[in-house]
Amino acid sequence: HQCLSPSSIEFLRKLPYRVDFCELGKKISVMHYCMNQKNQCINYTPNPTESNLLELFPERNQDIVIYGHDHTRMICHSQNRWFINSGSLGCPANDKNIARAAILEIEENNHISVRSVEIKYDVTKVVEYIDWIKYPASGEIKKFFFGVN
């Protein structure tokens, strides 16, 4: 991307496509989406159902899968596994002025809870900044990510 410095590009290239860790005995995987080793999305499914999620993330050794790519919130508990997509943090599309996030809590008694968070912010300032810096593909970005024509 032409707005990134060479060191930023190199940093991004070195990021893993998936991070696995354990917290209070719960196995957690964090990834952009279900991807192969070439960092390509596989089996993209918009608005996945519970059965879609079980197919998209078939590894049974994870207690919690945190993923993104699809900007629509999806929080699902199925077969003792959690699938968490908090939705888009900074690209509200048609839900103007809302940044979405989620809070995952794991208690020592093994109880897991997930809370959705919505925070209003001034998208106009972001769109104006995109124009000001002459961001590449700004028209498409504003249309698809911010609902601005």
State the predicted function of each range.
Residues 1-64:
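Conserved catalytic scaffold of divalent metal-dependent phosphoesterases
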Residues 15-17, 70, 88-90:
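Glycine-rich, charged/polar anion/phosphate-binding loops
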Residues 16-20, 72-73, 101:
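Short, acidic/polar N-cap/turn motifs at the starts of alpha helices
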Residues 31, 63-69, 83-87:
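Active-site neighborhood of phospho(di)ester-bond hydrolases with catalytic His/Asp-centered motifs
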Residues 36-37, 64-77, 91-96:
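Active-site environment of divalent metal-dependent phosphoester hydrolases
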Residues 38, 45, 52, 74, ...:
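Metallo-beta-lactamase
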Residues 77-149:
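Acidic, His/Gly-rich catalytic cores of divalent-metal-dependent hydrolytic chemistry
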